[in-house]
Amino acid sequence: MTRTFLLAIGLSLSATCFSDDHLEKGDHPYVFHLIQATLWNTAVENNETYFPPTYKVDGFTHGTSNPDKLLNVANHFYPDVEGDWYCLKMTVESLASTGVKTVFEGTAPVGDTQPDFDGAHDELFPHILGGIHPDAVLDVHQVLRDADGTFLSIEGVTTPN
């Protein structure tokens, strides 16, 4: 009885969390990526695909689909990274148009920083299986920070804290 019950739970979770539709679409229409402005400006100027500094370690480019999570993500992973930041807005389809697949999975470390921020484990996050080419980006939003490095808001995406 116990084995049957566990198998049924496993099948149910697999069908719910990893269906093809969920892997491709997620629950939100956009895929966001936080990026240092200097790195994005270089990619755009050279019309080249951007790969984040932790890509070789992580094996993918991190994204966030729920705009309500963006500031938690930024303040957890990047508070000590100085400089101006952007938030890139894309869709699964716009990424696919540049040959890049996106899958929705549980949170994962960024480099050696564990994903133990508030809300990290209550939904799936987009993992971009490649870099981001400027042609995949629908919009670029300015990220506002406090003098101490705290991420405060993303123009046109989030409301100020």
Regions found by a protein language model. Give the residues of each.
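Sec-dependent signal peptide recognition
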Residues: 2-8
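Boundary at the C-terminal end of the N-terminal hydrophobic targeting segment
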Residues: 17-19
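Conserved, structured core segments of small domains
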Residues: 21-161
